[in-house]
Amino acid sequence: MKKLILLIRKYISYAKDLANKNTTNYERFKNWMHAYIAYKSNESKFNPTYLPKYEQGQIIFVDFGCGIKHEFSYPHYAIVLNAHDRKKNDLLTVVPLTSKKPKHNQLKNWEHEIAYPIQNLLVDKVTNDFNLYNTKYTELRDKIIELGKIGPTIDNHEFTKQYSKLIEIGVNEIYANNKDILEFADKMSKGSIVETNQIKTISKSRIIFPTKKSHPLYDIKVHPSDLSIIQYKLVNHLVADTNKIDITK
C-alpha cells in the first residue's frame, strides 16, 4: 500500500510540474492516463472479431499513447502494414503518418512523402459517396424539391436566396456526416509524411477509427506505388541494406 501511495504522489508531482511547463503536453498526458486505465480495465473484454479486417495500405487513426523523447505519441494517423489481417488477430503493425512541416523540406532516409495526395483521396471519397437520395439527406432533398415547385412563383432574387441557403445546409450536412475524413483532408493539405523508423505493432484496441466498415475512412488506402516505396524503405533502412544483400546465395 505504501508503494502505491508513493506512486500516486509521484504521478501528482509530475503532473503538476508538466502543467506548469507545458499545458498542451499536460492535457495530452492527462487524457492518455484516462485512456490507458480504460484500455487496461477493458482488456479482458476486448474482442477484435467485432472489428473489420484491415487491409495493407489502409489508413487508420490510432492512439499511440504517451511515448518517450522522439517516439510517436498520442492519437495519430497510421498506415496498416499487415499483408493478411484476420479478425481474430488482436495485433496490427502500422507505420505513422504525419502532416508535412517545414522540417520535412529535406527528408531523412527513412521518411517518404506520399506522392498521390491523401487530401485528394479523401475529398474524392466524400464526393463519390454523396447521394442526395440517402436517408441522411431526406429533409434537404424534400426542401430542394419544394423549392423547384415554387420557383416559377417567386422572383429571381428570392429564389437565389433560398437556393443558396439550401446549398449551405447541404454543405454543412455533408461535413457533419464526414467530419473525421474532412478534418483529416484539411490536416494533410500541405502533404503527408510516412516515418518508417517509427514502425510499431499495436493492440487493435488502440484503433480510434475506423472500427466499422460503414465509417467513411474505412476503405481509404495509399496508392500502391507509395506502399511499395514504404516497404522498400522499411527493408532498406531498418532490416538490411539492400545494396549489400546477395540474393544469389
Q: Model segments located where?
A:
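Short, surface-exposed secondary-structure edge patches
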Residues: 48-53, 69, 83, 185
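Short, surface-exposed secondary-structure boundary micro-motifs
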Residues: 64-65
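C-terminal terminal-subdomain/extension
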Residues: 1-34, 43-44, 52-55, 105-249
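Short beta-strand-centered aromatic/proline hotspots
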Residues: 73-84
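Loop/turn positions that initiate beta-strands
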Residues: 57-59
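Short, conserved beta-turn/loop elements at beta-strand boundaries and strand-helix junctions
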Residues: 83-89, 100-101, 201
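A residue-level detector for short acidic-glycine micro-motifs
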Residues: 80-82, 96, 198
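Short aromatic-glycine-enriched beta-strand elements
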Residues: 76, 89-95
